[in-house]
Amino acid sequence: MAELSLAELREIMRQSLGEDEVPDLADADTVTFEDLGLDSLAVLETVNHIERTYGVKLPEEELAEIRTPHSMLIFVNERLRAAV
């Protein structure tokens, strides 16, 4: 079973930001995507990358409630476990 790690999410977010710097996710459970400089388009690019890489569909209506990298990680991994 594939699982998305915090390091993998961090790299995907870096690619979505289009920057060389990797976002600091030391406080991944409290820092928001907005705090990290990810606008809605960058978050959507992150989601699309995860869907392509992990072969899982992430419902947009549920994603709208996710504000932090930690919640994204939990959400994605729950979907990955359910897909098995």
Swiss-Prot record:
The protein's role, per its UniProt record: Involved in the biosynthesis of aklanonate which is an important precursor common to the formation of the clinically significant anthracyclines such as carminomycin, daunorubicin (daunomycin), rhodomycin, aclacinomycin T (aklavin) and aclacinomycin A (aclarubicin). These compounds are aromatic polyketide antibiotics that exhibit high cytotoxicity and are widely applied in the chemotherapy of a variety of cancers.
Residue span(s) of domain Carrier: 3-80
Top-level taxon in the UniProt lineage: Bacteria
Annotated positions of the O-(pantetheine 4'-phosphoryl)serine modification: S40
Pathway noted in the entry: Antibiotic biosynthesis; daunorubicin biosynthesis; Antibiotic biosynthesis; carminomycin biosynthesis; Antibiotic biosynthesis; rhodomycin biosynthesis; Antibiotic biosynthesis; aclacinomycin biosynthesis
Originating organism: Streptomyces sp. (strain C5)
Record keywords, A-Z: Antibiotic biosynthesis, Phosphopantetheine, Phosphoprotein
Disulphide connectivity of cysteines: none
SMART domains assigned: PKS_PP (SM00823)
GO biological process: daunorubicin biosynthetic process
UniProt-recorded Gene Ontology molecular function terms: phosphopantetheine binding
SUPFAM superfamilies registered for this protein in UniProt: ACP-like
UniProt xrefs under Pfam families: PP-binding
InterPro entries membership: ACP-like_sf (IPR036736), PKS_PP-bd (IPR020806), PP-bd_ACP (IPR009081), Ppantetheine_attach_site (IPR006162)
Name of this chain's protein: Anthracycline acyl carrier protein DauA
